[in-house]
Amino acid sequence: MRFVDEVVIKLQAGKGGNGCVSFRREKYVPRGGPDGGDGGNGGSIYLKADENVNTLIDYRYKREYYAENGRPGEGRNCYGKAGEDLYLVVPVGTSVFDIDTNKKIGEVLQHGQTFKLVSGGKRGIGNTHFKSSTNQAPRKFTLGEEGEYKEVRLELNLLADVALLGLPNAGKSTLIRSVSEATPKVADYPFTTMYPHLGVVKVGVDSFVMADIPGVIEGAAEGAGLGLRFLKHLTRARCVLHVVDICPFNESDPVENYFAVEKELEKYSQELFDKPRFLVINKIDLLADKVEQKCQEFVEQIGYQGNYYTISAAMKKGTDELAKKLNEFLQKQE
């Protein structure tokens, strides 16, 4: 299924039903009083989060949504039926932005959580309500109000504990495959990963969610490559793994590659740049000798002061230990 994380839709809540003008007419009661009932309220439209949904693709092809109108009131003080509410099912982590103001107006972050997008119109009232001592046979009633209309943008930000960051072909997809049951495409060419993937990493009785996004290239913060579109999925992660290919097949410099990604991350969002971040040196199986020494030299060259991990995602070397350390970090954050 294609991954879609941003759509624009139009919403029209239901109109309220009109009030009714009616008078009681029964045998032996030829001039009964007013008995016109109220109309029904118009239906509203809600977002509803579902953990089993992971894309907004359904809203790419259908862009307009209408809630049901309320029914008009009837005689004998019968109220009209309220319009049925409409629920739009979306992935957990979906935010809503008003197109006119471009402001965020809501979000759904937990399974089953709802958020009202537009409100149904208020019902009209029947002539029963207008009876008075001076007007025993009122013909006055009110119309139901129009339902609210709004055009909104839905944006999905994946909810993950750990996000993978790095250049294309750094081995991020191989890493998430090696520690979870996620199955992103893996190949020896850049941009194999076209859309984000989530994987659940299990460590004993604990588990956490890891996200793999398309690789970042120079200029991503300005929209180059696929990076800009998907960097937003890192914003809700609790920590970021910067995955570096220590032995690039294109013979590029790992040091320059590291700083290129760090530069784009800082340009895109200072908040994201300040998140807890760990260095993962990948593809150590491709180093002919002195693996530990070469990795240490790389760390010194980039001036990295934090914890770092050396792995071969393809050979699953060091990946279990990495998963354990990440789980320990996440447990301490709770």
From Swiss-Prot:
GO terms for cellular component: cytoplasm. SUPFAM superfamilies: Obg GTP-binding protein N-terminal domain, P-loop containing nucleoside triphosphate hydrolases. It comes from the Bacteria. Its EC number is 3.6.5.-. Its main location: cytoplasm. It is found in: Cytoplasm. Monomer. Belongs to the TRAFAC class OBG-HflX-like GTPase superfamily. OBG GTPase family. This is GTPase Obg. It comes from Francisella tularensis subsp. tularensis (strain SCHU S4 / Schu 4). The lineage of its organism: Bacteria, Pseudomonadati, Pseudomonadota, Gammaproteobacteria, Thiotrichales. The gene is obg.
